[in-house]
Amino acid sequence: MADYGAQLLWLRGEQDFLGNRYSRRHMLRFDGGVEIAASSSPHVVPVPMSDPAAVDPEEAFVAALASCHLLWFLSIAARRKFCVDSYADSPLGVMARNSEGKLAMTVVTLRPQVAFSGSRLPTPAEVVEMHHQAHAECFIANSVKTEVRCEPVFAAGTADSSTDD
């Protein structure tokens, strides 16, 4: 078992807190020293009280799911002796009412595009299986109720990459 944490800091300064006219911008700090500007989403709290240039919790949630999946996929591919040259994804989360009628991130769709090289290339079926296994192992996906879909995009770098699955 391991513990994971972060630090958050928000300061009111001279802002009109009681009048609900305060910035939602804050800082996230992680154990390696990385600091990221964070804010509420402008879809939830209008600008200028939110900062569209900062990471919002919804984006961070989608990114955490995609990052966890990526790391598991790379590990699985390496164990299976498939050389991954690149992995790109543009995950998309959908905020909607869940079965309890509450706003929630109800679906996150990953669209990974992986390029391989070497004499041993995975078939599209093997790529799909590695994505399935990565999803099953992902700590973040195993921690949430959100439906997480994986729709791999095939390009050059898989055996028989012209095959549609």
Regions found by a protein language model. Name each.
Residues 1-63, 71-165:
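Extended beta-strand/beta-hairpin segments
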